[in-house]
Amino acid sequence: ADSVGFAYRGDNSKVTVHKQRTCASELLDRIEVPQTATQLLVHVRDYTKGHPRVLPNNHPIRHGAVVGIHNGTIANDDELFAAHGIARAEPCMTVDSELIFALAEQFRGRTAHALERLVGSMATAWLDEGREELLLARGMGRPLWIGTSTQELFFASTRAALDVVEEYSSLKLRKREVREGSVLVVNGGRIVGRDSFRPDMSFEERPL
C-alpha cells in the first residue's frame, strides 16, 4: 500500500480525517475512533494518479464539505474539472478521485446524473458535511459489497472483507453486491434512498 487512512463523523456534521503513509497493519494499530462516531470510512491506497508524497492526494480525500474514498481510475478528471469550472481543493492535488467528490458537492442531491460523465472504473463512498447520510456508488469495473444487520451497514470491495467484519463483530450480515450504475443513500444503518445512472462502459482498465 502507498497510503492508508480513515474518516469518521460523530454526533455533529463535522468529518474528521486521518491519513498516513504506512501499511494497513500499522493503521489498525493506531486507529482511534470515538464511541460517538456513527459513520466510518477506511481506505488502503495503491496509487495510479496523484503521488502519495502529496498528502492531500491520499484517501480519504476532502473536497470542500465532502470527504470520500474511491477504488478505481477516472480517466477524464482534468477534462471535467475544466468543463464544470471547478478548482482543485488544493493547488498541489492531482489525484483523479477528487473529481467524484467535487461533483458530489457541486451537484448535491443530483450526483447520480453527474456521475454519468465519468470515464473510468469506480466503487466509492463519501460523507458530506452538508447532509447527514453516507453515500455509496458503483460505476463499472470495480466491485462494491454491502453487509447489513438489524442496525448496521458495512461496505467493502469484496465479500471476503465482509466475512472478516462478520467474524470479528459477531454480527450476522446479509451480504450482497451493489449493481453497476447504483447510488445508495444510507442513514442509521439502513438504505433510505436509491438512485441510478448509466456508467460509460467504454473504459478498459490496464492492470497495475
Regions found by a protein language model. Name each.
Residues 1-208:
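Conserved short alpha-helical segments that host acidic/polar catalytic motifs at enzyme active sites
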